[in-house]
Amino acid sequence: MRQWRHLACTELFEDAKNKFNCTCAAEYCGRFCQKRRATSCKEQLQKNRGSRSRVYQLFDPTTISLYEVFCDANSEKGFVWTLIESFSRRNKNEFANKPFYKGYPITQDSFTWSKFRLSLPRMIVTANRSTHVRATCNFNTEELQYRDYFRAKLSEIDVMRLNFDGCKKYEFISIRGYNCANCTAHFVQRDFWHAHQYWFALGSIDRVSIYQPIRRCREVRRRRR
């Protein structure tokens, strides 16, 4: 076996046309392993401004491994979102007693909308780079709808650390036809309760994403205000 900086190759003695079988190191991709993989949805968009909302393979430098995650770069102008959890109604009971500050990784290597959650270290790293959190319903089938939806600043609702039962400030919240902007509403997350609001039954909001800001987007948002 021959090894270069970003790839390892095995000689194929029985194949005259293809003499080597080469694989890239986890951090690299491309035909010649010349491209460094993104470590976040934000970095993916920065590397390729034409990136669309879809599942990407990202590189985790802590564990030197790849994982799959859905990056949303298109649904809300000025935002790029990293999906940290998704589950169907059928699977909601499996998540009902799992607050975000406790580890419960599921299908990180083979993404599925019906049952997915990043590991606790990966969620914490994502949150530390981010400014907002949101929850949506049926995003994979209906795209973004502002019914059964909330968005808040992580400085107000830090889902990765908050053990809380009380009122918190939201930028926007809409639950079963009731909505308000820049207002307070109930938020609950306890050691054996998944994050939720009292306005709706646990499990009706089932897609949670964290926003990673890009400098040019923050500047646009300030000008619009």
Protein language model features and the residues they cover:
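Mature extracellular or lumenal effector domains of secreted proteins
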Residues: M1-R225
